């Protein structure tokens, strides 16, 4: 019992304490702070360049690390000195625990005297450091790069060369859009690398505006902008121009090499027959069409501006633009509620007179006057590229018209126009609020509604193969969504449903744009108007 009591009542061993570095001691720009949470929360994280290296709060300009106020800083020094005294006393008591009481007292007195002198020295050094280096420590040790002189105000600024509406990109879409009356135009943007070729083709490039990445404001051209920012922008422009010049120089070198090869081939040819070589650059850019585009823009008084390729990429959102973009208004679509009753005599008269026009709906497209009218309805298609490819098929086969649902369908975007190779710009496209209402109203006027599906309508109306149907009356062909096809409410209105039979059971359907081309070609080839 005695031994146990001695063990329980024995003094606790002294806890080991870490050496606390005085705040004025700085090692490679790293500061350490007191662990006394009463005076100041624990913060022993190294700080460099205004950031905490291993967690903790960030330190910014005019932020005192070890004191939110000067009083905290003073209290922190006192707490540090007291903690140093306590630690020294505890260490001395533990080391001299087996000595006599007189020696212990002498040691304590000696330690106290030393601590008092050290404390006075620390306080004097601390005051000198704070008074002499108060400003230098914030910039030298924190290394904060913040400079209020470089701050740019939020004054509204507008780039001179910027899009106002939609970006119609691609040579064919731009070419067709300029000749049609479905859009209004703001500006034409041409890649700077095409200017030398346009000059060779006889275009006066002096009328083409050059981009300098300039900004305009309501009051001052350079309001709120520092010289460093302007220099950076000029450097960026110089780099882009150098890059464009390198591309142009490479192209010119290739052209010279091709000319040399052609001359050598001509000299070696006894018949003096000039051999033509395929020029990828001319084929890709289609410089002849580009020349007509620039000429038409000058005639229509549309500003033509030269920009670098990066600007064109940003306008087209990374899609291939072929070096030309037209800033234009959205495409105009016509509203339609139903198709009128078809008059076969009017169709025959137009065929005899060589005229064109819509078949029953007034579509305005050039159509096949020797065939019954065929209209295509797109019900809730989501992909604009599919919509563009389908309209391209419709324009190629000269059907009477296209109707798009105004709800839950992809609009005619620049991506659809590019996918249609410009067909969306000239082919008249109609839209309706209700597909079901449009079909029912047209059906009452004698139109045959044909849907596309893989399943039968019912037991009495099986789904027919495409070869089992003929275009022997005015017909409306419906194509459904890429995923789920036609809606049940639309299938109930259909007089017939057709499908394309494939040979691979693992793939049960085709892309909707491919399906449209096959169905339109098959229907137009299956019947003609009576003579």
Curated annotation (Swiss-Prot):
It is found in: Mitochondrion. The gene is mrm1. It comes from the Eukaryota. Gene3D superfamilies: 3.30.1330.30, 3.40.1280.10. This is rRNA methyltransferase 1, mitochondrial. It is an enzyme of class 2 (transferase). Residues 74-136 have a biased composition (Low complexity). It catalyses: a uridine in rRNA + S-adenosyl-L-methionine = a 2'-O-methyluridine in rRNA + S-adenosyl-L-homocysteine + H(+). GO terms for molecular function: RNA binding; rRNA (guanine) methyltransferase activity; rRNA (uridine-2'-O-)-methyltransferase activity. Residues 247-267 have a biased composition (Acidic residues). One of its GO terms (biological process) is rRNA modification. Keywords: Methyltransferase, Mitochondrion, rRNA processing, S-adenosyl-L-methionine, Transferase, Transit peptide. InterPro entries: Alpha/beta_knot_MTases, MRM1, MRM1_MeTrfase_dom, Ribosomal_eL30-like_sf, SpoU_MeTrfase, SpoU_subst-bd, tRNA_m1G_MTases_N. The keyword Transferase applies. Residues 1-40 form a transit peptide. Belongs to the class IV-like SAM-binding methyltransferase superfamily. RNA methyltransferase TrmH family. Residues 70-141, 230-277 are annotated as: Disordered. Its EC number is 2.1.1.-.
